[in-house]
């Protein structure tokens, strides 16, 4: 139960409070963008990770709900939901650089590769740009087709 409370605090309460701190200024300007980086796992589920999936799913729900609440103030709220992105925290270089290990890691990804951090950065830049002004309440999976 303490682990669940900690996960909810980090993945739901903190983003909620951060968004709440920014919204008054955005409302004054009658414009703004809030972009959460969540996870693709709630879009599909993941055995043995129900606590994480639940917390991340709540963050996705927060994005959709805030989009409904804040749209009238010209504030767009979206979320990028990555999974299977190259990162030494999740995929150590010794595994990524080993063809057998990489094949095992990517076997469930339709595109058969890991995403690159710069691809996530480009997606974030798009959502932060004027090109995304008519997009709100969207959860964008970034998982090579896995979710």
Where are these regions (language model features)?
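Catalytic Tyr-X3-Lys loop
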Residues: 1-16, 31, 35, 52, ...
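A short, exposed helix-loop element centered on a Lys and neighboring polar residues
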Residues: 19-20, 64
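Catalytic loop of short-chain dehydrogenase/reductase
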Residues: 33-58, 63-72, 84-85
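A glycine/serine/threonine-rich, flexible loop-to-helix segment
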Residues: 72, 84-108
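A conserved structural motif in NAD(P)-dependent oxidoreductases
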Residues: 109-120, 131
